[in-house]
Amino acid sequence: MSDIEGAGEVRDEDAFDVEAVAAWLREQGTDIGGPVDVRQFGGGASNLTYSVRTPTHDLILRRPPTGKKARGAHDMGREYRIQAALKEPFGLVADMVALCQDDAVIGSEFYVMQRVDGLIPRRELPPAVDLDEAAVRRLCTGALDVLIRLHRIDPGSSADLSALGKGTGYVRRQVEGWSTRFRNARTEDVGRQRIERSETVMAWLDAHQPDDVAN
């Protein structure tokens, strides 16, 4: 599936010590059985995703991007624990292998999970995927059905899930966080009119937040 999966050579700026990861996997009890082949998935703007293949395992490694990061963003431990907790009630989650919170291994936290084969949706579907109108409809309604299943899971039904919630305040945190990030990222050439329009939108969002509920 190499022409569909989109994994290619690891970008120089995103490379890491493969042997260090191999040694760490062995320490976690994963018998990798030989040399490790690492490739990087393109796209995405959050965390970096790699294919890690050995003679005995087909794995995925996730790590934060390099450079300056927003406070609280790219939390590998939280991402790992959410997926691990969803495995039993939801099912459509990869098996988690192990979480590394020791920056000394590759310079950042990371985690490894089993690979689940499938298509990574992008702006253009690959030529090998030829869907007629009926198939596209089934694909879209199927995706919606899965999202509905996911959002019907009660976080209080599992001790692992309930421990991950931050209670109320999700919308407020999002509005305040993204407004702050926008203000910090904008440059002098943005222009006064564009800044004023942006501030108007942010003020509207701040004033029209929906009623809060625990999440």
PLM feature segments, named:
Residues 35-200, 204, 208-214:
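ATP-binding pocket architecture of kinase catalytic cores
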